[in-house]
């Protein structure tokens, strides 16, 4: 890995940071506040929330697969990013008027609640469609197009830090719109909140239209649309692209470990005998430290490559989970969280850069859909249930997205660490593959 690093211009860096951050802000709203909104506004049940999460995950996967192949066939990324981001923003703004619309259309409160739940789930899928079109499919394909194996570690160091940094932005902004009832119940001014977030996303789409350069991928010709879509799921494709699919398998295992922990992480910190409502004073600095570590570690990934850099963040993740399992004192929770989050983001940067390095140049769009299937859909269908199962002795078993009746146990961290150990087996296979191909 001694190649001269390919430079990335300032304007391109600005576009990367802007689209990555704002995209993750929008996803943070979808992943965290839609769940709260559907409960606060319409009294949704935990099963309603679970249905919404599952429907959204399936929508994201199918959209990324279909649009990824489409963008490969037409040889364009920018148009999808710009158009998708603009409509994505308007779809978020639509949530600002859902309560008013349901009140006007429904006959009574019960009908308004049922209609509100249905509309929220439907609009969540619509919002996810445009978000996945713009971000998961087109932006990530563009990011692969414009980078190479000399600078992808740096880019992924920045890109991988955005999901947690966006949580700080979203929750910090939401605190300004927080409403506390006389009985202590916390809710938010949702119309203003969704309008502001939607406007930010729309403005980002306009900025992308002005600043973003087309990556000009070569348009694919020959195969039919469905044949190209099926290509990524064939055993022959996995055999012909063994390094890519091994990295995807390793990322899938690690993402399952993360999904054992992360849906319950904030709920755990907020438990009165852990940190209570002061959890933000521990989580926020940990996120900043972990993000800084990942941005800097990305440079090391570029210099040394995947196999030489993946072990450290995996060990940090396991060590952090071990501390969080064994201790509940605030200093231990801080150190454990710092290690776990640093390991989480660092591992994601390593895996993401390696996936881009092994992605076939003529199937970049399709590969984004395969990535979402392997590292988002499958882990979301597996990990949360493991987390809820190990916590069953100390709380009501639930899907783990929201729910005040659910009390996660520290065993979620032990389970997450245990699942992550299987990642070491896959990384060993990756090293064997690299030696065999050398």
Indicate where each model-derived feature is located:
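Glycine-rich segments within core transmembrane alpha-helices of 12-TM secondary carriers
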Residues: 61, 153-178, 372-384
């Amino acid at each position: 890995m001694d190649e001269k690093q390919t430079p990335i211009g300032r304007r391109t860096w600005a576009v990367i940071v802007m689209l990555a951050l704002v995209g993750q802000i929008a996803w943070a709203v979808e992943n965290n506040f839609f769940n709260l909104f559907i409960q606060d506004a319409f009294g949704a049940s935990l099963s309603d929330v679970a249905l919404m999460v599952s429907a959204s995950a399936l929508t994201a996967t199918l959209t990324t697969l279909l649009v990824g192949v489409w963008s490969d066939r037409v040889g364009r990324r920018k148009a999808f990013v710009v158009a998708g981001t603009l409509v994505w923003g308007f779809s978020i703004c639509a949530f600002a008027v859902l309560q008013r619309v349901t009140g006007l259309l429904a006959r009574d409160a019960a009908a308004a609640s049922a209609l509100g739940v249905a509309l929220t789930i439907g609009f969540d899928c619509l919002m996810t469609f445009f978000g996945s079109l713009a971000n998961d499919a087109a932006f990530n394909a563009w990011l692969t197009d414009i980078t190479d194996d000399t600078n992808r570690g740096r880019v992924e160091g920045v890109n991988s830090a955005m999901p947690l940094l966006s949580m700080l932005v979203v929750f910090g902004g939401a605190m300004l719109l927080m409403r506390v009832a006389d009985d202590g119940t916390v809710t938010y001014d949702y119309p203003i909140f969704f309008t502001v977030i939607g406007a930010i996303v729309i403005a980002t789409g306009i900025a992308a239209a002005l600043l973003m350069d087309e990556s000009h991928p070569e348009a694919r010709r020959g195969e039919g649309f469905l044949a190209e879509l099926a290509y990524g799921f064939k055993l022959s494709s996995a055999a012909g692209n063994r390094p890519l699919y091994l990295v995807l398998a390793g990322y899938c295992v690690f993402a399952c470990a993360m999904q054992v922990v992360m849906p319950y992480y904030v709920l755990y910190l907020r438990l009165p005998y852990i940190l209570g409502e002061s959890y933000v004073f521990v989580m926020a600095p940990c996120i900043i430290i972990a993000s800084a570590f990942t941005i800097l570690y990305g440079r090391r990934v570029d210099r040394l490559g995947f196999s030489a850099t993946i072990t450290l963040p995996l060990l940090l993740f396991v060590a952090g989970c071990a501390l969080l399992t064994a201790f509940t004192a605030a200093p231990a929770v801080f150190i454990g969280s710092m290690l776990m989050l640093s390991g989480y983001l660092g591992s994601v940067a390593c895996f993401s850069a390696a996936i881009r390095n092994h992605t076939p140049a003529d199937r970049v769009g399709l590969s984004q859909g395969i990535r979402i299937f392997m590292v988002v859909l499958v882990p979301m269908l597996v990990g949360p249930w493991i987390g809820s199962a190990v916590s069953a002795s100390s709380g009501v078993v639930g899907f783990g997205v929201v729910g005040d009746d659910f009390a996660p146990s520290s065993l979620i961290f032990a389970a997450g660490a245990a699942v992550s150990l299987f990642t070491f087996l896959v990384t060993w296979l990756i090293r064997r593959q690299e030696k065999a191909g050398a």
